Amino acid sequence: MTIIECNEEQFVNDFYDLIVGLWYGDKYDTQNKQHINHIKRKIHVTFEDFSVALCAYTDEGEPIGFFWYKHDTGLEGVGFSGKDAHIISCELIEKFQRQGIGTLLLNEVCNRVKSNGGECLYTDTYTANGDSMMFYIKRGFIPVALLPGLNGINDDGQVFMYKKL
C-alpha cells in the first residue's frame, strides 16, 4: 500500500464517487449539470482553501480511500496561527474497510499536522453515524459540540470532535 498527497485532478478522478456519496448520498443526480458543476466547484474551492488529500492506493495502483483535511499554517511569526486543522472528509472503498487502513491514514494526518505546527485536530460526523463516531473516539477524539439541524430542521445534526496532537 502507498499513501500519497493527491492533487485535485487525481483526487477527482479516483474518489469523485466517494465524495458525492459522503456529501449528498442518493440525492445527487448524475444527469443534472447543476449537480455536477456544484460538486466540482465545491471540490476545487476546498482544494484552494489550504486542503490536503492523503490518498491510499494498493501496490497495483487501485484506489483504497482518503483523508481530506485542511491545515492553514498561517502567517510566519504569528503565534496563534496554524495551531488547528480540520478533517473535511474521509472514506475508504467498502472492500478495504475494517483493515486498519483508516487508522493508518488518520495517523499520517496527525503526524503531518503536528510536524507543521498544528496542536489539535477537529472533525465532525453525522450524529446517526455511530460507526464514524466510534472510529474517532477509539482514536482519542473527544466529542465537544452538537450542531442540531445543520442539514435541515428535522435533521439530527453533526457532532464535532477534537483531538490534542
Where are these regions (language model features)?
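Conserved GNAT acetyl-CoA-binding A-motif
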Residues: V113-T125
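Short glycine/proline-centered loop/turn elements that form peptide/ligand docking sites
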Residues: G102, L106, N129-S132, G149-D155
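Acetyl-CoA-dependent GNAT
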Residues: C6-S89, I93-K95
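Short beta-strand-to-coil "C-cap" segments at the C-terminal boundary of structured domains/repeats
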Residues: Y162-L165
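Extreme N-terminal starter segment of soluble prokaryotic enzymes
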Residues: M1-T2
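Conserved acetyl-CoA-binding loop-helix of GNAT-fold acetyltransferases
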Residues: L92, R98-N111, M134-K138
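Conserved catalytic-core motifs of GNAT/GCN5-like acyltransferases
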Residues: Y122-T125, I137-Q158
